[in-house]
Amino acid sequence: NNGKFLLRIEDTDRKRSSFDAINIILEGLEWLGINYNDIPIYQNSNINRHKEIANKLLNEGKAYKCWASEEELLRMKKIAQKNNSNIGYNGLWRDKEPTNNELGKPYTIRFKAKKNGETIVNDKVQGDVLFQNNSIEDFIILRSDGSPTYMLSAVVDDHDMMVTDIIRGDDHLNNTAKQIQIYNALDWKIPKFSHIPLIHGDDGSKLSKRHGALGIDYYEKNGFLPEAIKNYLLRLGWSHGDKEIFSETEMIELFNLKNIRKSSSRLDIEKLKNLNNHYIKS
């Protein structure tokens, strides 16, 4: 469809975005032969743009400053857990004016989430997923150190990069409901979303290293071929009849979102090894 594949490194969380971690991503893509257009875009380089949008929302009354202390936040969280509620922040500063005690102290900026009605995620894989707005708390878009959160940065960058289609794990569905509210608050066009099931271990539990969930560099160093890895990942949760072996051209031509299953797939290392043997022999 003549689309572009842009690589964005989401490095706003500086503690988790080391040079080595980023390099593993870049080298892994190169080894797999997954080529992106243009140069990588580092999210942190757009931090001033993210702050600009946070302040725009603040000035328009769609966000607010929050001076809640760690003790207050912990107390709210405990109350929420006791009441079995998803709302960990009770909107303490939503309509509260600061006093001299707060002025000059660090604060976060929270998005003023809608409290009435519902937010619907029109998803290409999951169908329409409905969220009651009273279950979405006022979430932080700018931390007390002035750094933007993923929730805001991803929306701003997707808009500025003219991203039309977002395909990601279904663990992001809750985030998407929040991000749709940001899109609407800014009167920006909402991209098409597709939330695909996560890969689980062979026992059905959350994937971990004991299941073989290791970095792509592990498989490269242990004799796996990139063709086998791509073929195996393609067939996890997606099918085209009974066909098991796909050339790269076939992968591109045949893949579609409508054949993705809603249920989670299980990582089967033995099947991956067998597929790898096929590619070694061919």
Residue ranges and their predicted role:
Residues L7, E60, Y64-K209, G215, ...:
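Active-site cores that bind ATP or allylic diphosphates and position pyrophosphate for catalysis
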